[in-house]
Amino acid sequence: MDKQLLETAVGKVLEEMRERPIPLGISNRHIHLSAQDFAHLFPGQSISVKKALMQPDQYAAEQTLTLVGPKGKLEKVRLLGPLRSASQVEVSRTDARTLGITAPLRMSGDLQGTPGVRLVSPFAELEITSGVIVAQRHIHMSPLDALILNVSHGDKVSVAIKGDERRLIFDNVAVRVSPDMRLEMHIDTDEANAAGADNPQVCAMLVNKS
C-alpha cells in the first residue's frame, strides 16, 4: 500500500477511535480505609467484596460506616477496597455541607491540609484528623487510550456529557494514565445531577484539551 494512503487510513481510524464514547462512572460518597483503621472499626473482620467496580481490582465492600461532622451525619456510606495506606473520605459539595465540613477539591491521595471526620461502625468509632475531600473529576485510561486520544497523564481536558435532557461540558477534567486502568470518566453525584446524567447508559465525549 502507498505510504500516503496508509497514513490516511491510519489517521481515519484514529479519528474514529477518538470520537468513541467514554464510559461514565458516577461516584457516590465513599470511604477508603487503611488496614489499621479498618481493624479498629471492624475488629476480627476482613474486608468483603459486595460488587466489583470497572477499574481492575477495585470493589465496593459489604461494610458501611456513618460519617459524623459538626452539623450532621451521613449513614450507610460504602467502603471501597482494597485497603490503602491512608484513610480517605470522598464526598460531594452537598454532602460536605450536610456534615458541616469545608472539604477541598483534590485528586485522590492528595490529603495534606484536608479536614477530618468521625467514622462510626456498628462496633467502634474513630476520629480521623484529615482525609476528607471532594474528588476532582477525572478520566482513567491506559497508555494505549492516552495515545489514541492524544493526551498525557496530568493533562486537563474538556469533556461533554449528554444526559437524558441536558448537555453539559466539564472543563478541567484530569487525565490519569496507568497500565492498570480502564477507560472511564468519574464525576460525583452533584456533577451528575447538573448534567442530568442519571441514566447508566450515558457516556462522555472528549472535546479538547483545557
UniProtKB/Swiss-Prot annotation:
Record GO biological process: propanediol catabolic process
InterPro entries xrefs: PTAC
GO CC terms, sorted? bacterial microcompartment
Binding of CoA occurs at I26, S27, N28, K71, R78, N193
Subcellular location(s) per record: Bacterial microcompartment
Q: What is its EC number?
A: 2.3.1.222
A GO MF term: acyltransferase activity, transferring groups other than amino-acyl groups
Q: Which residues bind Zn(2+) 2?
A: H138, H140, H186
Provide the residue positions that the database annotates as binding phosphate: R84
Cofactor(s) needed:
Zn(2+)
Residues annotated as binding Zn(2+) 1: H30, H32, E90
The lineage's top-level taxon is: Bacteria
Pathway, per Swiss-Prot/TrEMBL? Answer: Polyol metabolism; 1,2-propanediol degradation
Q: How is the cofactor bound?
A: There are 2 Zn(2+) ions per monomer; Zn(2+) and CoA bind inbetween the 2 domains in each monomer.
Q: Which cysteines are joined by disulfide bonds?
A: none
Task: List the catalysed reactions.
Answer: propanoyl-CoA + phosphate = propanoyl phosphate + CoA
Domain description: Formed by 2 beta-barrels, each is capped on both ends by short alpha-helices.
Q: Which family does it belong to?
A: Belongs to the PduL family.
- Write the protein's name: Phosphate propanoyltransferase
